[in-house]
């Protein structure tokens, strides 16, 4: 029964994808590069995300996909969701985490907004670490209808389990750009 319900939800959620905005972007940080994609509703609804990040100082990687729900409340957008993350830290074991969290975007004008989000996967929502933490905050400027620029700060860390050390995967400021269609 669960598989049938999940299949129906997946099919119904993709029926409205044509009415959603899509975005493909890249970020270059003080310690990392990141590629990301987003399929999101204009005001309210289900959104999908995907990203891959690499810390080029020592080769640490993380990547994943996410699903969430967004609600627009005038000048603010609130969202909550869950992700499936693959981690390949330099120290410790490769593994998966299923963080849950959310975020907010506060619009100062039609072109400029501030954003912040946080996700965590405590024990039971991951397999190789004790805890996974991800935080992202910054400012975005919609330069044109199809071009967005971002400046922000991103942090991803894991707390070790069973003798595995704590480890920071990403920690630093970044500049980014995205194409929307």
Where are these regions (language model features)?
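Cleavable N-terminal export/targeting peptides
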Residues: 1-23
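Short glycine/proline- and aromatic-enriched beta-strand/turn motifs that initiate or cap beta-hairpins
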Residues: 17-69, 112, 176
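Membrane-embedded beta-strand positions of outer-membrane beta-barrel proteins
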Residues: 24-28, 48-50, 80-82, 102, ...
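Transmembrane beta-strands of outer-membrane beta-barrel pores
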Residues: 28-32, 41-43, 50-56, 71, ...
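Residues that define the transmembrane beta-barrel architecture of outer-membrane proteins
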Residues: 29-35, 44, 59-65, 76, ...
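Residue-level signature of outer-membrane beta-barrel architecture
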Residues: 39-41, 69-71, 104-106, 141, ...
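Repeated loop/turn-to-beta-strand initiation elements of outer-membrane beta-barrel proteins
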Residues: 43-48, 73-80, 110-116, 141, ...
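Outer-membrane beta-barrel "beta-signal"
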Residues: 139-143, 168-181
């Amino acid at each position: 029964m669960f598989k049938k319900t999940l299949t129906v939800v997946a099919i119904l959620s993709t029926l409205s994808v044509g009415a959603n905005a899509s975005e493909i972007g890249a970020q270059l940080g003080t310690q990392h590069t990141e590629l990301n994609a987003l399929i999101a509703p204009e005001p309210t609804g289900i959104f999908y995300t995907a990203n891959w990040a690499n810390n080029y100082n020592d080769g640490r990687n993380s990547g994943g996909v996410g699903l969430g729900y967004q609600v627009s409340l005038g000048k603010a957008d609130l969202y909550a969701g869950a992700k499936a993350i693959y981690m390949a830290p330099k120290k410790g074991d490769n593994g998966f985490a299923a963080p849950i969290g959310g975020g907010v975007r506060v619009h100062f004008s039609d072109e400029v907004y501030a954003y912040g989000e946080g996700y965590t996967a405590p024990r039971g929502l991951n397999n190789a670490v004790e805890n996974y933490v991800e935080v992202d905050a910054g400012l975005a400027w919609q330069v044109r209808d199809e071009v967005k620029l971002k400046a922000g700060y991103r942090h991803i860390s894991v707390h070790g389990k069973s003798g595995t050390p704590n480890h920071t995967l990403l920690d630093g400021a970044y500049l980014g750009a995205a194409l929307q269609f």
